[in-house]
């Protein structure tokens, strides 16, 4: 038996009072059945979560969500105390991750929070303090 299986057997013994190979196999089969519930390609999720891991990008998404309207870099700059270049770079990363939308009108580019970002922020807000 592998070390993982031995540890699982110890867990089952604690839970059930006793454990045999059939108990271990049944638990392993049950656990393996959940594999299909995992995303086949988690890259999009991981990109979105890691992109929000920057304070600048997180603040921009929160700001766009709070204002509930499109904003230009020059409007974001007074609130997010970094250079216009850093804001533009952060917005580009957020767009690539699917967390903001953008549109160009004349010389101006406007950004707004995406539905996905709103859902992530809502999940964070709904679970704040649960840790």
Model regions: which residues?
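Short, hydrophobic-biased segments on the C-terminal half of alpha helices
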Residues: 91-92
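Conserved segment of winged-helix/HTH DNA-binding domains
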Residues: 113-131
């Amino acid at each position: 038996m592998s070390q993982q299986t031995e540890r699982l057997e110890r867990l089952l013994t604690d839970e059930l009072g006793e454990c045999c190979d059939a108990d271990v196999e049944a638990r392993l089969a049950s656990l393996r059945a959940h594999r299909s519930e995992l995303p086949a390609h988690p890259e999009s999720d991981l990109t979105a979560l890691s992109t929000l891991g920057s304070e600048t990008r997180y603040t921009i998404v929160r700001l766009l969500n709070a204002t509930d309207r499109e904003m230009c870099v020059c409007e974001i700059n007074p609130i997010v105390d970094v250079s216009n270049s850093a804001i533009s770079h952060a917005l580009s990363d957020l767009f690539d991750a699917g967390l903001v939308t953008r549109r160009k009108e004349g010389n101006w580019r406007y950004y707004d929070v995406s539905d996905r970002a709103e859902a992530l922020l809502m999940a964070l807000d709904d679970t704040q303090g649960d840790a």
